[in-house]
Amino acid sequence: EPPGSTILRDLNTGAPNGVLLEMDDFLEGKIPAPTIQELASGVAEASQALVSLGITALQDATPSNSISRWETFVALKSDDALSQRVTLMIGGESTTKFLRSGVGRASNDMNLRVGAAKLMVTKTSGSLFPDVTAIHETVRKLDNKGFQVAIHAVESEAVSAGAEAIAWTRTSGSQLRHRLEHCSEMPPVTLEQVVASGAIVVTQPGFVYASGRRYLAETAAADHPWLYRIGGLRK
């Protein structure tokens, strides 16, 4: 298994059951990519479906977004395959290349723009990945480069580590407001850390509607009050 990833297995046989967690980058390198024509056709169909729902703007939060992905979006926009305005988050490791190229950073074109630098923090494999030291170092470097950081954090340990890293940027005088994505699990201490950090919390009430029963079934009853604490954040 790649670091930070998990291949779920049958409890009796130990054989992989087909569920792969946090393995997007690995799979992207193994699955043949569609041609630009195939991609444009699929994107055009999806774009029209979104238009029919009144959706006029999108944000791609894929953590592996790179210069080449940006160029793909430029081509899709140029060919009118994609009519929505697009904000493209970029992978933290790609920020130096974006800065050197100047791509999207100084543009006032709202049809396609560079957004936050995405950092994945997970506990899918049983331990925090990356570790706390690496999280702090990455957030510090991205903040120094002038990028807003969007930290994917679901488990309480991930939320806590992300909040601590963001809080540090405030003590250093940063004027940027960084993001915590999801914040699915927040016991009282973690909630206090998030509030104190000043982070923008980007959570998904729709997940509760779509998967709330599963969350309750798969989470210990004692932890139910700490799931998706949108009301607690508002207070």
Kindly label every feature range from the protein language model.
Residues 54, 114, 152, 180, ...:
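Divalent metal-coordination and catalytic microenvironments
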Residues 61, 147-157, 203-205, 233-235:
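Short acidic/histidine-rich active-site segments
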Residues 63, 89-93, 117-122, 152-156, ...:
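Active-site beta-loop-alpha junctions enriched in small/polar residues
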Residues 70-75, 96-103, 159-171, 193:
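Distinct, well-ordered alpha-helical segments
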Residues 176-188:
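Aromatic- and carboxylate-enriched substrate-binding clefts and catalytic-loop regions
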